[in-house]
Regions:
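Conserved alpha/beta-hydrolase catalytic His-Asp/Glu region
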Residues: 157-159, 176-232
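Catalytic active-site module of serine/aspartate enzymes centered on a nucleophile-bearing elbow/loop
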Residues: 264-295
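Alpha/beta-hydrolase fold catalytic core
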Residues: 1-54, 78-79, 118, 293-295
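Active-site loop/oxyanion-hole signature of alpha/beta-hydrolase fold enzymes
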Residues: 69, 82-123, 286
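Short beta-strand/loop motif that positions the catalytic acidic residue
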Residues: 234, 240-242, 246
Length: 295
């Protein structure tokens, strides 16, 4: 059986699910590229060019359009919405070299400076929330306001060790089989109904723009992230949006982050899980828009 499975993996066609009903792309937003040093980053923009910018920062394993295609259009009537793919994500540059979340923040700061977009309201989801915190810490000129969704300041030590082991096992499995995180991510979002059946092919293709080593480098950077020594000194207004049923970033971690921030407002999404940007776009967009008006 093992030999047959290996032969099929080597010589058989790649697995692709059946896509029904007729398929479409959910948000056909044209992108351009910006160089920061020698690295090239994909940037997409929409909304009035003279409006205040809102930068939507995506999470681990996704892409800017892949995670914000439901929230972004709801903000674009009144704001200049900016989306950037991180290194190793979406259509931006790849690297297997080790890096830190601080490096992703430096990348984003370089993009904002190149496009003359600072200061901006920076909205970070999941890993993007860690990047947004580092951006406000390392490049305070770039951030007018922070919105943090489904994110944290640090991992508890025991959880960090467990997730580091799991990350190594996932990387090994993906190297051996070619199957892993993209498939599980796409299937989960489809199974929960977070992504409409019409966009299933797009989701499948979007999640497969990665490789095991690049994905692991991003995962390990996130596991090393710890903002607790300095997050309490961030001198910007912050909104923390907490999915109350978050299965990946436990809500107590999110409340702990909020407790460190000196100027913070809270919004709780009572029935939301970690995939809140897909399932609760109207609530999130409204919270962001009202926060920008108030602060």
């Amino acid at each position: 059986v093992a030999v047959a499975a290996a032969a099929w993996r080597l010589f058989g066609p790649p697995y692709t699910p059946r896509f029904r009903p007729p398929q479409s792309h959910p948000w056909r937003l044209r992108g351009t590229t910006v160089f920061v040093g020698d690295r090239e980053f994909l940037v997409r923009q929409t909304g009035p060019v003279d409006a205040e910018p809102i930068v939507l920062v995506h999470g681990l394993g996704g892409s800017s359009v892949g995670e914000w295609y439901r929230v972004g259009p709801l903000l674009a009537d009144d704001h200049r919405v900016v989306l950037v793919d991180h290194r190793n994500h979406g259509l931006s540059a790849r690297t297997t070299e080790p890096f830190e979340i601080a490096d992703l923040a430096d990348d984003l700061a370089g993009v904002l400076r190149a496009l003359d977009l600072e200061p901006a309201t920076v909205v970070g989801y999941s890993m993007g929330g860690a990047v947004a915190q580092e951006l406000a810490h390392r490049h305070p000129w770039a951030v007018r306001r922070l919105v943090l969704i489904g994110t944290f300041a640090t991992h508890p030590p025991r959880v960090r060790r467990i997730r580091q082991i799991i990350t190594g096992m996932i990387r090994a499995w993906e190297r051996l089989t070619g199957v892993g995180t993209p498939e599980s991510r796409a299937l989960y979002l489809r199974w929960t109904g977070a992504v409409d059946a019409r966009h299933w092919r797009w989701l499948w293709e979007e999640t497969h723009r990665r490789d095991p080593d690049a994905g692991a480098a991003s995962s390990w950077a996130l596991l090393r992230f710890d903002s607790t020594p300095w997050v309490g000194r961030l001198a910007v207004p912050a909104l923390v949006v907490i999915p109350a049923r978050d299965q990946l970033v436990p809500p107590p971690w999110q409340y702990a982050l909020a407790s460190h921030l000196p100027d913070v407002e809270l919004v709780e999404l009572p029935d939301a899980r970690h995939e809140a940007p897909w399932t609760h776009p109207e609530t999130i967009a409204t919270a962001i828009g009202e926060f920008v008006k108030r602060r």
